[in-house]
C-alpha cells in the first residue's frame, strides 16, 4: 500500500530558512550561503520522508518565498516595473517582486484560501509575455535524484494559477484571465517535457480551485486545459491534487473525467462529503490519493478511525489504487515535535507536527497492507483515550456556562443611537474624535525588559516600574498631540493572541511550533486543548494604571474571541463555535471587570473575523451567525454609557457588511487607507450605518508620513458618504511596528487634519 505527502514546511525545524533569508536580505550573507542552507533543508526533508517509507515524496514544494510566486517566475510573468527582459529569473528580480526594492513596490500579497498563509498575487493581462524563465522544478527533481530519492515534482496547476491572479493595473475589467490559458500552456508543456526527460514518472498538479463555487465556464476551462496537455502528459502518471474543503458534485464530475490524468487527491478531513461522492462513483483504473491525515492542525491522527475510512474506500477503488496521503500540504502545521522539550508530557502525547504526520501516513499505509505496527497503534489509542478522559480538557463549570447561552442572542437592550447619546454625555467628545488603534512602537529596550522578565533576570517590581514608565510616555505623547481617546500602548504584550492565551486556562504554548505566514515571517499559534476560562483579570491592572495618568478617556484593549480562535491551533474534539463561545465568556468576564475598574471605553479587536469565512458561500451564514454572536456575548452585560469599540484588519469586507452591523458595536475602526473607494462604496450604495465608524485615514504599514492636507482630503471624502456625528479619525492599524520618529509626525498630521475639518464645519473644539 502506497503513501504520499502533498507538501512539507520549508522553514526548517528551527526556522533555519527564515534566518538565512533575512541575513541575505540584510546583505550579511551571500546568495551562495542562502542556496547552501536551502539545499541542506531540502536534502533533510527528502531523506526524512524516504527513511519513513513514503513512496510518493514531493519535490518543488520548497520555496524561498511562495509557490505561486515560483510559478510566476516559471512562466516569466514578471510585471514590467521589475526590469526583467528575458533569460532565467535571478534572486534579485524574484525578491523584488515579493518585497519591493528601493524604487518599486512589491506585488500584492493575499491569503491562501482560508489559511493563515499568504501568496504573492500574479498581475496578468493581454500584454504579458510568457516564457520558461525558471527551471526550479526540474532542478530540484534532479537534485533529489542525485541524492538517491525519487520524487513527484509539484506544480501549481494552470487553471488555479490564472484564477488566483488579478488583472494588472490598467487592464480592462472585462478581460477574462482564463483567456490566457493558450499562452501559459506552452510553458507548462516545456516544463513537463523536461521533467519527463529527466526521468520523472509521476507529476502532481495542484488545482485547489476545484473546491470553490465555480461557474460552468470555469469548470470547462479545466477540461480544455487538460485536453490540451494530454499528449505532453502521456507516459507520465499525473496526480491532480485538491484540498481545504469538500469538492462540489459538479466539480467532482469534471475533475474525475479530465484527460491525461491518472490520479485524484482529496482532503478527506475537511471534505467528508467527498467520501460519499467517491463511493457513488470513481473512475475505474484510476488512483485515489486519500487525504486522511490533517495537514492543518497539530493533533495526532485517530489511526483506527482513519483505517476504517481507508478500508471503506479500498472496496471502491481497489487495493492497488488507494494511496494514503495528507489532507493538504504540511506547510500549514508546525515542523517537528522533537524540538518541544518543555511542553507538558501529557499534552505532547496528543500532538503530531509535520514530521510525526509523515510517520502516521506511513503507518496507515502499512496497516492497510496488513503490516500493522501494533505498538504504534496502541500508543496512539492510549493517547486519544487520555485526551478524551483528561480532567484538564473538561471543565464542568465552563460547559454549564456555555450550555446556558442557548436561547439568547445576547444583544444589548438599548438601541445604538440611545447608547451613543449616553456615552457622549459621559465622554463629552468633539465631532470627528481622534484615537489610535491600540499599540505604540515596541522599542529594542522594551523588548529587552519583557524578555529579561520572562527569563527571571529582573524582578517583578523592576518590570512593573519599566512598563509603567513606558505607559506614562505613551500617555504624555497622546496628550501633547491632543488626541481625544487614549490608549496605553500595550507595552506589556508580545502578541495580541499569545498575551491572552497565556492567561486563559485551556491553552498551551510551544517553543518551536512555528508556521510560515509569508516570506520569512512565521507565527507560533497557541494550542487550545481544553475548555477555556479566565482564572483572574488579565488587563485591568494596566488599563486602570493608564487611566489614572490622564483625565481623558482611556481605552481598554482586548482581543476578540473569533480572532483568538482563528489564530490558534484549535481542539478538534468539539465544533469550533463551541470553543469560540467559551472564549467569548472569558472575554465577557474581562470586559465587566474593566468597566468596574473605571474604564468607560473598551475595544474588542476582531482583526481575523473575516479570515475564518468558509470557502463555500453555502457555509457563510452559519459561520457569520456564531462569529457575530460570540462578539455580542463579550459585551452584552455593560451599561449603555460604556462605549464598545471593535477593530477590523482587512479591507475587503463589503460582502459581510450586514454581519458587521449585526455585531452591534458602538464604534468600529477599519483598516481602509489602501482601499478607500472599496469601503466607501458600501455606504454610497445606501447601506444604513448608525454607529460610530473610523475608516483608517493613513497606512501604518508604510514608513511614509502623510501630510495634514492629504488626511483632511481623506476625511472630506468620508464625510461625503458618512454623517459627521458618527465619523472617527484614526490610523488604520496598531503602531507597534513603526518607529516613534514616524509615529509622532503622522499622528500630529492626523489631529491637525481633524481640527481643520472641525473648524470648517463650524464646530471648533
Curated annotation (Swiss-Prot):
Tissues and organs where the protein is expressed, per its UniProt entry: Expressed in leaves, stems and siliques.
Compartment(s) of residence: Cytoplasm, Cytosol
Residues reported in the UniProt entry to bind Zn(2+) 1: 647, 649, 671, 733
Cofactor detail note: Binds 2 Zn(2+) ions per subunit.
Binding site for 5-methyltetrahydropteroyltri-L-glutamate: 18, 116, 495, 518, 521-522, 567
Domain of life: Eukaryota
Binding site for L-methionine: 437-439, 490, 605
Annotated catalysed reactions: 5-methyltetrahydropteroyltri-L-glutamate + L-homocysteine = tetrahydropteroyltri-L-glutamate + L-methionine
EC number assigned by the record: 2.1.1.14
Metabolic or biological pathway, per its Swiss-Prot or TrEMBL entry: Amino-acid biosynthesis; L-methionine biosynthesis via de novo pathway; L-methionine from L-homocysteine (MetE route): step 1/1
Active-site residues, as the UniProt record annotates them: 701 (proton donor)
GO cellular component terms attached to this protein's record: apoplast; chloroplast; chloroplast envelope; cytosol; plasma membrane; plasmodesma
Chief location category: cytoplasm
GO BP annotation list: methionine biosynthetic process; methylation
UniProt: L-homocysteine binding residues: 437-439, 490, 605
Cofactor(s) the protein needs: Zn(2+)
Binding site for Zn(2+) 2: 658, 662
Keywords: Amino-acid biosynthesis, Cytoplasm, Metal-binding, Methionine biosynthesis, Methyltransferase, Transferase, Zinc
Pfam family, one: Meth_synt_1
Family to which the UniProt record says this protein belongs: Belongs to the vitamin-B12 independent methionine synthase family.
PANTHER family, per the entry: 5-METHYLTETRAHYDROPTEROYLTRIGLUTAMATE--HOMOCYSTEINE METHYLTRANSFERASE (PTHR30519)
Physiological role: Catalyzes the transfer of a methyl group from 5-methyltetrahydrofolate to homocysteine resulting in methionine formation.
Name of the featured protein: 5-methyltetrahydropteroyltriglutamate--homocysteine methyltransferase 2
Amino acid at each position: 500500500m502506497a503513501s504520499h505527502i502533498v507538501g512539507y514546511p520549508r522553514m526548517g525545524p528551527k526556522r533555519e530558512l527564515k534566518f538565512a533569508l533575512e541575513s541575505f536580505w540584510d546583505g550579511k550573507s551571500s546568495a551562495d550561503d542562502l542556496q547552501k542552507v536551502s539545499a541542506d533543508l531540502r536534502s533533510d526533508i527528502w531523506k526524512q520522508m524516504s527513511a519513513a517509507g513514503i513512496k510518493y515524496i514531493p519535490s518543488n514544494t520548497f520555496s524561498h518565498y511562495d509557490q505561486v510566486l515560483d510559478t510566476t517566475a516559471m512562466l516569466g510573468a514578471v510585471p514590467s516595473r521589475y526590469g526583467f527582459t528575458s533569460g532565467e529569473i535571478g534572486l534579485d528580480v524574484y525578491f523584488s517582486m515579493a518585497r519591493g526594492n528601493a524604487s518599486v513596490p512589491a506585488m500584492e500579497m493575499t491569503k491562501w484560501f482560508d489559511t493563515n498563509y499568504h501568496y504573492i498575487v500574479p498581475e496578468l493581462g493581454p500584454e504579458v509575455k510568457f516564457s520558461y524563465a525558471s527551471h526550479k522544478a526540474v532542478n530540484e527533481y534532479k537534485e533529489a535524484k542525485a541524492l538517491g530519492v525519487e520524487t513527484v515534482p509539484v506544480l501549481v496547476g494552470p487553471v488555479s494559477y490564472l484564477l488566483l491572479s488579478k488583472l494588472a493595473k490598467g487592464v480592462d475589467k472585462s478581460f477574462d484571465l482564463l483567456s490566457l490559458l493558450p499562452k501559459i500552456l506552452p510553458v507548462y508543456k516545456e516544463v513537463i517535457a523536461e521533467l519527463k526527460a529527466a526521468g520523472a514518472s509521476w507529476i502532481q498538479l495542484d488545482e485547489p480551485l476545484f473546491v470553490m463555487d465555480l461557474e460552468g465556464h470555469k469548470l470547462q476551462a479545466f477540461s480544455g486545459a487538460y485536453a490540451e496537455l494530454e499528449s505532453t502528459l502521456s507516459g507520465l502518471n499525473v496526480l491532480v491534487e485538491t484540498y481545504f474543503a469538500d469538492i462540489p458534485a459538479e466539480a467532482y464530475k469534471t475533475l474525475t473525467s479530465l484527460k491525461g490524468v491518472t490520479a485524484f487527491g482529496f482532503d478527506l478531513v475537511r471534505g467528508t462529503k467527498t467520501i460519499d461522492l467517491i463511493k457513488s462513483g470513481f473512475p475505474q483504473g484510476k488512483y485515489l490519493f486519500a487525504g486522511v491525515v490533517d495537514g492543518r492542525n497539530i493533533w495526532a491522527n485517530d489511526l483506527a478511525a482513519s483505517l476504517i475510512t481507508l478500508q471503506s474506500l479500498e472496496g471502491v477503488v481497489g487495493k492497488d489504487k488507494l494511496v494514503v496521503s495528507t489532507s493538504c500540504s504540511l506547510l500549514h502545521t508546525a515542523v517537528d515535535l522533537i524540538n518541544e522539550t518543555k511542553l507538558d508530557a501529557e499534552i505532547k502525547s496528543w500532538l503530531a507536527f509535520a514530521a510525526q504526520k509523515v510517520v502516521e501516513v506511513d503507518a496507515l499505509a502499512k496497516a492497510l497492507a496488513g503490516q500493522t505496527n501494533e505498538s504504534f497503534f496502541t500508543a496512539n489509542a492510549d493517547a486519544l483515550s487520555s485526551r478524551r478522559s483528561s480532567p484538564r480538557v473538561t471543565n464542568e463549570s465552563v460547559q454549564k456556562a456555555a450550555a446556558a447561552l442557548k436561547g439568547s442572542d445576547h444583544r444589548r437592550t438599548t438601541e445604538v443611537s440611545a447608547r451613543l447619546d449616553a456615552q457622549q454625555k459621559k465622554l463629552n467628545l468633539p465631532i470627528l474624535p481622534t484615537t489610535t488603534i491600540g499599540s505604540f512602537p515596541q522599542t529594542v529596550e522594551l523588548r529587552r525588559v519583557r524578555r529579561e522578565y520572562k527569563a527571571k533576570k529582573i524582578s517583578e517590581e523592576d518590570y512593573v516600574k519599566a512598563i509603567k514608565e513606558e505607559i506614562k510616555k505613551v500617555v504624555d505623547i497622546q496628550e501633547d498631540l491632543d488626541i481625544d481617546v487614549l490608549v496605553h500602548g500595550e507595552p506589556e504584550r508580545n502578541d495580541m493572541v499569545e498575551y491572552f492565551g497565556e492567561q486563559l486556562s485551556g491553552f498551551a504554548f510551544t517553543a518551536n511550533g512555528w508556521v510560515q505566514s509569508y516570506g520569512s515571517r512565521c507565527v507560533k499559534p497557541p494550542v487550545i486543548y481544553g475548555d477555556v476560562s479566565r482564572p483572574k483579570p488579565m488587563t485591568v491592572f494596566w488599563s486602570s494604571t493608564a487611566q489614572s495618568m490622564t483625565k481623558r478617556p482611556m481605552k481598554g484593549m482586548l482581543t476578540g474571541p473569533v480572532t483568538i480562535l482563528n489564530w490558534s491551533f484549535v481542539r478538534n474534539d468539539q465544533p469550533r463555535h463551541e470553543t469560540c463561545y467559551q472564549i467569548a465568556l472569558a472575554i465577557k468576564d474581562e470586559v465587566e471587570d474593566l468597566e468596574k475598574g473605571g474604564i468607560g471605553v473598551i475595544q474588542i479587536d476582531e482583526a481575523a473575523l473575516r479570515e475564518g469565512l468558509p470557502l463555500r458561500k453555502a457555509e457563510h451564514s452559519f459561520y457569520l451567525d456564531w462569529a457575530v454572536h460570540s462578539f455580542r456575548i463579550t459585551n452584552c452585560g455593560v451599561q449603555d454609557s460604556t462605549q464598545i469599540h471593535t477593530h477590523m484588519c482587512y479591507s475587503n469586507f463589503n460582502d459581510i457588511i450586514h454581519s458587521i452591523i449585526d455585531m452591534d458595536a458602538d464604534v468600529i475602526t477599519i483598516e481602509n487607507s489602501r482601499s478607500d473607494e472599496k469601503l466607501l462604496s458600501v455606504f454610497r450604495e445606501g447601506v444604513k450605518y448608525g454607529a460610530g465608524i473610523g475608516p483608517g485615514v493613513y497606512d501604518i504599514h508604510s514608513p511614509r508620513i502623510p501630510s495634514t492636507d492629504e488626511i483632511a482630503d481623506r476625511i472630506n471624502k468620508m464625510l461625503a458618504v458618512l454623517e459627521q456625528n458618527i465619523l472617527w479619525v484614526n490610523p488604520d492599524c496598531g503602531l507597534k511596528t513603526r518607529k516613534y520618529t514616524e509615529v509622532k509626525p503622522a499622528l500630529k498630521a492626523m489631529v491637525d487634519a481633524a481640527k481643520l475639518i472641525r473648524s470648517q464645519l463650524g464646530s471648533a473644539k
